[in-house]
């Protein structure tokens, strides 16, 4: 019984350790934060907190559909390097992603 109790206590910790997603907000025609460092294979969750549509792309890696206010886009980075995430709709929006 004691082992079962300890196992149940550890389950939430194990679940949290597997979460490899970070949240990037799109607000005020900007990505926030504007620069991140992540591990290869990690996922970034882009949340549109503006009142208009956004989109995200990295040349040669991904190009998303348009997303309205409150919508979310999840993208992973399978290669190491430094990448610039942009928005086709708002070309001044830039996020630098360093993938280790």
Put a short name on every predicted segment.
Residues 1-4:
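Positively charged n-region of N-terminal signal peptides that target proteins for export
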Residues 8, 15-100:
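Extracytoplasmic copper-binding redox domains, predominantly the cupredoxin/blue-copper superfamily
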């Amino acid at each position: 019984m004691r082992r079962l109790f300890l196992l149940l206590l550890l389950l939430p910790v194990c679940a949290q350790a597997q979460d490899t997603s970070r949240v990037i907000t799109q607000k005020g025609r900007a990505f926030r934060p504007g620069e991140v460092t992540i591990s290869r294979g990690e996922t970034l969750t882009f949340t549109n907190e503006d009142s208009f549509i956004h989109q995200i792309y990295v040349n040669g890696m991904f190009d998303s559909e348009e997303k309205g206010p409150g919508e979310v886009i999840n993208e992973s980075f399978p290669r190491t390097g430094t990448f610039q995430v942009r928005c086709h709709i708002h070309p001044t929006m830039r996020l630098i992603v360093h993938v280790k």
